[in-house]
Regions:
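C-terminal membrane-cytosol helix-exit motif in multi-pass small-molecule transporters
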Residues: 168-191, 377-384
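Cytoplasmic helix-loop-helix junction between adjacent transmembrane helices
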Residues: 98-136
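Helix-loop boundary and gating motifs at the non-cytosolic
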Residues: 1-47, 210-216, 221-238, 245-246, ...
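Structural signature of the two symmetry-related core transmembrane helices
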Residues: 68-83, 274-289
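Intracellular juxtamembrane helix-capping segments at the cytosolic ends
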Residues: 106-120, 312-327
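A late C-terminal transmembrane helix in Major Facilitator Superfamily
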Residues: 328-358
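Central cavity-lining transmembrane alpha-helices of secondary-active solute carriers
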Residues: 41-59, 250-262
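Helix-to-loop junctions at the C-terminal end of transmembrane segments
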Residues: 53-66, 152, 259-272, 355-356
Length: 390
């Protein structure tokens, strides 16, 4: 009973600290007068460092050292937040961002392996696992900016210090909780009789739609990454406060998380055009609100939620499509990580900063992303119609 609570707490917390830091750093750079590429590049730098270090960690990762690596990542997180508090100079922000990327990789890469060592062979259904995985990390990413938005509303420019103090304090229980979870799991395994595994969901006879999961991910996650990186740069220029900008980012991930939770009891919609088409239309509508409604804060709040719904539907499909055919799951999951990582790395710079720099129009990235989502959505719809006819 306590193990799922502990692991859920760990999942939410490490995404909370990432989410808050990735909104605080660009906002502080904007306040210091940094250029658009320096601001939008924060997410790209973090993603690149995280991806490279995750690959390196994968070379030494085993079930035996997974817990120690998770604790090492926690210690690196603590050092990062301590550094952001004690050496907070603007020129040091990218250095601490590099350390955050390393800490994220050292923590997250072994985390799933560590959870597997606690399960003792128990498995959730594919649909449930896909939905809950997508919901848990996005909820943590939502809570981080949300807490910072609340702190920003009540403090005079020092909310970032309070946020980093909270992040550092969270690392203390997080460091020891994996040991507690491991001991509880060992005790449970000794005293309980293993239950026969529940029948697994079998979708292996369904069409292989992994390619469409990756294409949709490019559209949806590019929308999230670009919007998230541009808001700290464009929001203050439009007169929005740190509180409002942070809340917009938070609403994207809340939309993603609650959409994922709504999909826990999914049956067959993943193989029908209507679900993804509806999600894509939400994304297009949300992006267009950023194009034509940037002067109205409520339009941006609504647009953020709609973009979150789009990424929630696609995030579920990404995980589900890659695991629906077990014989290909290993390769597909690896491609998932490459797709998400490269999208998070390239889109803020190329679509975000790049298109604004080339055109001089702040709305151009959102318009381009809405066109990309429409094209991929139409191609997906065409493919699903072909499958239905065959």
């Amino acid at each position: 009973m306590f193990i799922p609570v502990i692991t859920s707490f760990l999942t939410v917390c490490f995404n909370l600290v990432i989410g808050s830091t990735l909104i605080i750093v660009p906002l502080r750079l904007k306040e210091a007068g940094a250029g658009i590429f320096a601001i939008t590049g924060t997410l790209s730098v973090w993603a690149v460092v995280c991806a490279v270090c995750a690959w390196l960690i994968g070379q030494i990762l085993t079930e035996r050292n997974a817990r120690r690596l998770v604790q090492t990542g926690t210690a690196l997180y603590f050092l990062c937040f301590l550094g952001l508090l004690l050496v907070p100079g603007i020129r040091m922000q990218y250095f601490w961002l590099l350390l955050l990327g390393i800490a994220t990789a050292v923590y997250c890469a072994p985390f799933q392996v560590f959870l597997k060592t606690l399960e003792n062979g128990k498995q959730a259904g594919l649909v449930r696992a896909s939905a809950l995985y997508s919901a848990s990390w996005s909820f943590g990413m939502a809570v981080g900016p949300f807490l910072f938005s609340m702190l920003s509303a009540g403090e005079n420019g020092m909310a970032w210090k309070t946020a980093y103090c909270i992040n550092a304090a969270l690392m203390i229980p997080i460091f020891f909780l994996p040991v507690l979870a491991e001991k509880l799991a060992t005790r449970s395994n000794r005293t309980s009789t293993p239950e026969p595994p529940a029948p697994a969901d079998d979708f292996s006879n369904k069409p292989d739609l992994a390619l469409w999961g990756w294409l949709l991910t490019v559209a949806a996650f590019a929308a999230v990454a670009t919007t998230k990186s541009l808001l700290p740069e464009q929001g203050p220029d439009a007169g929005y406060s740190e509180t409002q900008v942070s809340l917009m980012v938070s609403l994207i991930y809340f939309g993603h998380s609650f959409t994922s939770l709504c999909l826990v009891r999914s049956k067959e919609w993943m193989y029908k055009a209507s679900g993804v088409t509806a999600g894509t239309l939400c994304g297009i509508a949300g992006l267009l609100l950023f194009v034509f409604g940037f002067g109205n804060v409520f339009c941006l709040y609504a647009g953020s939620v709609l973009i979150g719904i789009f990424s929630g539907v696609v995030g579920f499909c990404l995980v589900f499509y890659s695991l629906a055919h077990p014989e290909k799951a290993g390769k597909y999951v690896a491609i998932n990580e490459i797709t998400v990582g490269s999208t998070n790395t390239l889109s803020p710079l190329l679509i975000g900063g790049g298109l604004v720099w080339l055109t001089g129009w702040n709305g151009m990235p959102y318009l381009a992303l809405s066109v990309l989502a429409a094209v991929i959505g139409l191609l997906y719809l065409k493919r699903m119609i072909q499958i239905k006819k065959s």
